[in-house]
């Protein structure tokens, strides 16, 4: 990303919807005039445990690594769809999507068609809300070509853009 690039008022196409896009799209909303997000596959998205640690917690930070290792083990056992944890994974991701995306069509586009854990699980608190904005469009039709003026999908969707970003 060029350090001198100013996205203000620009029409931007974000090609991809994985980890980079999950960070980039919310950052560009409200700055760019329009975002077209080109998605090939939906991702499993979990809440991002973001926030400040309270002062009382700081002495326990050393033990945190062990806690996260234990949680990782527990988490990986939940990738089996038949397990209680697997059902919990599905319930959490489904609830998160329903609570943040009201449009059923957009929600369907954002629902993974594979078992959780088959692809990288992403963490974000603001990606889904960013995609519900009027100035953001999620495009799931395959890209047919990239022209000097923008990205064109197989169904001819897409519009002129001033910058394409591979994410």
Across the structure, where does each feature detected by a protein language model lie?
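Rossmann-like dinucleotide-binding core of oxidoreductases
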Residues: 1-102
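Helix-loop-beta segment of a Rossmann-like dinucleotide-binding subdomain
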Residues: 106-118
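Core beta-strand elements of the Rossmann-like FAD/NAD(P) dinucleotide-binding domain
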Residues: 6-10, 157-167
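A conserved short coil-to-beta-strand element within the FAD-binding core of flavoproteins
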Residues: 1-4, 113-116, 136-154
């Amino acid at each position: 990303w060029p350090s001198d690039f100013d996205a203000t008022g620009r029409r931007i196409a974000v090609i991809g919807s994985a980890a980079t896009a999950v960070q980039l799209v919310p950052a560009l909303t409200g700055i760019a005039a329009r975002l077209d997000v080109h998605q090939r596959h939906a991702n499993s998205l979990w809440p991002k445990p973001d926030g400040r640690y309270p002062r009382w917690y700081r002495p326990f930070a050393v033990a945190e690594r062990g806690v996260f290792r234990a949680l990782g083990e527990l988490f990986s056992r939940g990738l089996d769809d038949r397990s209680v944890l697997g059902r919990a994974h599905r319930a959490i991701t489904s609830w998160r999507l329903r609570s943040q995306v009201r449009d059923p069509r957009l929600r369907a586009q954002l629902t993974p068609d594979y078992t959780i854990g088959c692809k990288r699980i992403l963490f974000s608190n603001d990606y889904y809300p960013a995609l519900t904005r009027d100035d953001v469009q999620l495009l799931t039709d395959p890209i047919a070509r990239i022209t000097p003026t923008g990205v064109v999908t197989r169904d001819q969707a897409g519009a002129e853009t001033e910058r394409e970003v591979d994410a």
